[in-house]
Structure formats: structure tokens, C-alpha cells
From Swiss-Prot:
Core subunit of the mitochondrial membrane respiratory chain NADH dehydrogenase (Complex I) that is believed to belong to the minimal assembly required for catalysis. Complex I functions in the transfer of electrons from NADH to the respiratory chain. The immediate electron acceptor for the enzyme is believed to be ubiquinone. Belongs to the complex I subunit 3 family. Keywords: Electron transport, Membrane, Mitochondrion, NAD, Respiratory chain, Translocase, Transmembrane, Transmembrane helix, Transport, Ubiquinone. One of its GO terms (cellular component) is mitochondrial membrane. The chain crosses the membrane at residues 7-27, 62-82, 87-107. This is NADH-ubiquinone oxidoreductase chain 3. It catalyses: a ubiquinone + NADH + 5 H(+)(in) = a ubiquinol + NAD(+) + 4 H(+)(out). GO terms for molecular function: NADH dehydrogenase (ubiquinone) activity. The keyword Transferase does not apply.
């Protein structure tokens, strides 16, 4: 149990620090009345043209998910490319299988029209 003491101490310190950082702003804040102008969106000194929490097109969400997936692909390819001279054929073909699966997924999304902005 003694080998877990540093982990427990750091966990307790981080929890205490988090609680302190959550409580201190409430202690030092002033309880002034809030005006509707302070709660509205600020648009460079002009009156707001619309609601700040407006809906956005679902295609933006889809493109962001696709970006994250293919960005993670690059993070997997970088260590593979750095150690390319040291890996054997199994490492090469496993990465080619990974690339094939991602390419099939990309072609599927392209075929379904996920990347079209009509």
C-alpha cells in the first residue's frame, strides 16, 4: 500500500486545489443584480441581430467528425513512417490494411454525399 502513497497524495492535492479554485470565485464575487443586456450576446456595440444560440447545419458536425477521424489517421501514420526501416512485413501490411479500411470509409462517405455542399 505504501507504493501508492505518492499517487494518493497527488490525487488529494489535485482534488483540494480543484475545490479551492471552484469556491474562491463565489466568495469574492459581488452579488449585483443582473441586467438583460449583460446576459445577451455582444456584437461589437450593435444591438444583436439574432439569437447567439442559433442552430447550425448538421453537415458542419459531419465534416468535423470526418476531420477528427482522418486527423487521427495521420497520428497513426507518423510513428509508422518514422520506424519504417525497423518494422517487418507484418507491420507494413497491418498499416496497409488500416489504410484500406480508412479509404473504404472515405469513399463510402463521399458516395453518400457527406462532403457535398448543395
Amino acid at each position: 500500500m505504501l507504493e501508492f502513497a505518492p499517487i494518493c497524495i497527488s490525487l488529494v492535492i489535485s482534488l483540494l486545489l480543484s475545490l479551492i479554485l471552484l469556491v474562491v470565485p463565489f466568495l469574492f464575487s459581488s452579488n449585483s443584480s443582473t441586467y438583460p443586456e449583460k446576459l445577451s450576446a455582444y456584437e461589437c456595440g450593435f444591438d444583436p441581430f439574432g439569437d447567439a444560440r442559433s442552430r447550425f447545419d448538421i453537415r458542419f458536425y459531419l465534416v468535423s467528425i470526418l476531420f477528427i477521424i482522418f486527423d487521427l489517421e495521420v497520428t497513426f501514420f507518423f510513428p509508422w513512417a518514422v520506424s519504417f526501416n525497423k518494422i517487418d512485413l507484418f507491420g507494413f501490411w497491418s498499416m496497409m490494411a488500416f489504410l484500406l479500411i480508412l479509404t473504404i470509409g472515405f469513399l463510402y462517405e463521399w458516395k453518400r454525399g457527406a462532403l457535398d455542399w448543395e
